[in-house]
Regions:
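Positively charged n-region of N-terminal signal peptides that target proteins for export
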Residues: 1-4
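Repetitive helical segments and hydrophobic/amphipathic motifs
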Residues: 11-12
């Protein structure tokens, strides 16, 4: 399977105690290009700009098992629960492949809880509508037996079966009140220190 590189050219605006966090772009890397260990540099291919129709014809879950979020604070590598939450992983990968996540930021940062991104509204400097954007559709929850703990990659939602594009990475040791309410579709395998750096950034009242 291949690894997908999310290239959050993470732009951090640290002004007056406020933070506009992560920007993302995505590029696929074939299995033959994967590093032997997480310590090696993952090669980056040219930015992908495929049309949605082309991507929709491809089963991306069978091709990509991981993704790398590249930020200006370092890289975050996540591994997917592709066999347990296939629809969620497929949705994430298709949005990534079509460039939907390009320029999106981690718009919500809550210390000792989580960092959240994936909202297209966060691409600009208008804070007022961050957190309410999406891809224009919603899809059902896809729960599994994995608990939401530190490092978990999960879908943000506004209630049952309202998944779209927003996701979050858990920083708390455990979050039992979220289990069975948010689809857990992966986990951080490298770069949790980067997640912690993002979590430590100053925020504003929107967080």
């Amino acid at each position: 399977m291949k690894k997908l590189i999310l290239i959050p050219a993470l732009i951090l605006l640290m002004t007056a105690g406020c933070t506009k966090t992560v920007k993302e772009e995505i590029t696929p890397v074939a299995d033959s290009q994967l590093p032997a260990s997480s310590e090696q540099q993952v090669p980056v291919v040219d930015k992908v700009s495929e049309q949605s129709k082309q991507v929709s014809e491809i089963n991306l879950v069978s091709q990509y098992s991981q993704a790398v979020l590249k930020t200006n604070l370092g890289n975050i590598t996540v591994k997917f629960y592709g066999s347990e939450s296939p629809k969620t992983v497929e949705n994430f990968l298709k949005l990534a492949q079509t460039g939907f996540y390009d320029g999106v930021r981690f718009h919500r940062v809550m210390k000792d809880f989580m960092i959240q991104g994936g909202d297209p509204n966060s691409k600009d400097d208008d804070w007022s509508n961050d957190g309410i954007g999406g891809p224009g559709y919603k899809f059902e929850d896809e729960f599994n037996n994995h608990k939401l703990v530190a490092g978990s990659l999960a879908m943000a939602n506004a209630g049952p079966n309202t998944n779209g594009s927003q996701f979050f990475i858990v920083t708390a040791k455990e979050t039992p009140w979220l289990d069975g309410k948010h689809t857990n579709f992966g986990y951080v395998v490298d770069g949790m220190d980067v997640v912690k750096k993002i979590e430590a950034l100053p925020t504003n009242q929107n967080d």
